[in-house]
Amino acid sequence: MQCSLVEVSVSVDWPRLQKALTVEVERGFQNLQGKQHRFGDFLCLSFGSPPPPGSSPGDRQKWREFAQRFAQYDQLEEAERKSLVASTRRFLHQLRRSLESPPRDSVPKKDLLAQVNRPQVSEPRYPKSGQIELHTPLATVVSQSQHQTKLLKNLGLATVEDLLFYFPRDYLDYAQQVTIAELTAGETVTIVGRVVNCTCFTSPKNQNLNILQIQLRDQTGRIKLSRFYAGKRFAHRGWQEKIKKLYPPQAVVAASGLVKSSKFGLTLDNPEIEVLDRHSPSIDSFKVGRVLPVYPLTEGITADFLRKLVLACQTAIAKLSDPLPQEIREKYELIDLQTAIAQIHFPENTEKLSLARRRLVFDEFFYLQLGFLQRRYEQKQQQQSAIFTPHGELLEKFSDLLPFRLTQAQQRVVNEILQDLNKPSPMNRLVQGDVGSGKTVVGVFAILAALQGGYQAALMAPTEVLAEQHYQKLVSWFNLLYLPVELLTGSTKTAKRREIHAQLSTGQLPLLVGTHALIQETVNFQRLGLVVIDEQHRFGVQQRAKLLAKGNAPHVLSMTATPIPRTLALTLHGDLEVSQIDELPPGRQPIHTSVITAKERPQMYELIRREVAQGRQVYIIFPAIEESEKLDIKAAVEEHKYLTEKIFPNFNIGLLHGRLKSAEKEAALTAFREKQTEIIVSTTVIEVGVDVPNATVMVIENAERFGLSQLHQLRGRVGRGSHQSYCLLVTNSKSNDARQRLGVMEQSQDGFFIAEMDLRLRGPGEFLGTKQSGLPDFALASLVEDQEVLLLAREAAETMMVEDPNLEAHPDLKIKLVQRYEKLLGGEILT
């Protein structure tokens, strides 16, 4: 789902939002189904867009919080829904009124920024080591052991500047304390009291669960707090005694958390507990009465020690230079860097913390986007590619022979590609298209432009199944154009392989489709002008680079059927031009999608029998090919045997999984395509590329094991013909999170909406797969919460590249860009 700032600025439909809220109230908070989305999802998406321009930082924060709260709407009890809807209506009313007619006594934005320009920071009470500079070693600032110095270096903290840019991961708001007597269930609070007693023990009911219990008292009463530690290592007696010693009798403790009611009275839900002062007879402490930072720690470095160190380094903040140009700071209402660093560590209040965080998040995004754009600019300056005309006989013939008209979205993307190919700098464009949107035909226009210019093209796919699918489709088109095309995979026979190599090197073969086999040293093109990479995220950087090296700065077109939200695309592929095919060909029927449990299997089997009896075909998908007791995942191999012998003995059932030999895979797919088998049991090998219009049922077992985007890809294997299709998501999971995610699939067929919800519900790491996600190493920025800031930073970076592409007028920014860009990417090039 694409969302630009221009669109957002005019798309906050206040009456529609209020009407949705009113109807939800009138219908008893049932999470009503609208034309496209359920009420909760509609509100989640509405608040997921950037806040209206002119909103205060506080209102921006509340706007983002509402997005997160409505993401959980389906799980809320009626009373909780009622409370959320009421608070939302109040917030929207107040926000709209403040935007349309700001109160006279409100502080103007610029005045508010001016107020935090020089924050008052408490002076450290620790000995100073002379004049503190940014390059001063931390070992000379505060007294510390050699072991502590080593531990700090392990955290990447060697100098004062390192520490100033080591940001807190959270905050404890000791400024807003309540007494024990004032506790109210449902509120998040902080209490301060003295330890009466402390125990740590292993639960008698669960040997893997260990419980820390602390009884606190203040002048108004007593409370018992519990923290839980899961894992056998916490059951060790030595560890338990060590933890108890942290909370000796009379130690002053601050505890922060959600107040909940239990059978023993009020308590805090698994609270954050902070020892303030173990020896002082009073509760006076430099920590109480302010918002305290909580830093990522390592064993041997305490929170107290790190805070003292940060306080001692505060005087060096004045030495920081701000490389961000003043005109950018003014345009985007950003506070200066010195203020932001001071307030991020020891904020005076939440408003100033919000301003500080916004500035530093902007910096992270700005340096990343500027780095991407600079890299693209330098590549274009250094490389010269062939220029392909956007017109010609081949392109016209292909347009005429197509049995359908391109959608408006397809035509728009084709035009963007042909414009790129008509320039001397190499194209580097990513085409995103929803399932069935017609990416392949768009790619063919690019291929034909290269061929009619006298160059060769290569199309690389991640699997043999997908490569074969592309090859078959291209052959059907290229035969009509009298153009040869060949397929090269790991299964290609030696004789055929040699023939292909010879034809490539002489230029006789204009187009080669294949898998990783294309990057072998023996594959040599005479004149490679275009590389098309399908499902490009499946290939590593080195694999893509090897293929590009087979030509002289060839144009590159990447394609993916896995929609990526715009913020994620900017973060991963900021140096690419991104096109979206956000329209499906006419005539596609919505796929009827249902989440079912094991109890409903008889009805599912009956649906399959009915569809097969009408001549249709069925996919049954499993997440693994071996039985796994740990995850309780049904194996495709075992289930194939069970279905064949017990459930559908009269049907022909095929089997497809990743461990079959290539010939066996192709045989299974061919049998399914040619209707020799009515049902195919498969793992996710079937996920992309397989096109069987006669298939109308997709059954996905253990659906909770898949990401939403992957489920959407699998569902896209049906619904390709004129008959009604069905997708059945089978799960036995009792998890509310799993049920909520699968509910999104029932409600929407829009891949971009599903990708956006997947990102919100699972976060970018889970969305991409944490092992090779390629995500930049952000210290503060969140791709879910900070989408608005990312878009502003991209806009600022694009403006900078237009006005000063070599940064000659901004030398400080140029130096800082190299440091920050490399740090964000971990020294690696992503694309």
UniProtKB/Swiss-Prot annotation:
GO biological process terms held by the UniProt record: DNA recombination; DNA repair
Domain Helicase C-terminal per the UniProt entry, residue ranges: 600-765
Listed name of the protein: ATP-dependent DNA helicase RecG
CDD domains reported in the protein's UniProt record: DEXHc_RecG, RecG_wedge_OBF, SF2_C_RecG
Species the sequence originates in: Synechocystis sp. (strain ATCC 27184 / PCC 6803 / Kazusa)
Gene3D superfamilies linked to this entry: Nucleic acid-binding proteins (2.40.50.140), P-loop containing nucleotide triphosphate hydrolases (3.40.50.300)
Motif (DEAH box): 534-537
PANTHER family documented for this protein: ATP-DEPENDENT DNA HELICASE HOMOLOG RECG, CHLOROPLASTIC
Keyword Isomerase set for record: yes
Function per UniProt: Plays a critical role in recombination and DNA repair. Helps process Holliday junction intermediates to mature products by catalyzing branch migration. Has replication fork regression activity, unwinds stalled or blocked replication forks to make a HJ that can be resolved. Has a DNA unwinding activity characteristic of a DNA helicase with 3'-5' polarity.
Known partners and oligomeric status: Monomer.
EC number per UniProt: 5.6.2.4
Domains as described in the record: The wedge domain within the N-terminus inserts into the replication fork junction, where the lagging and leading strand split.
Disulfide bonds: none
Residue span(s) of domain Helicase ATP-binding: 420-581
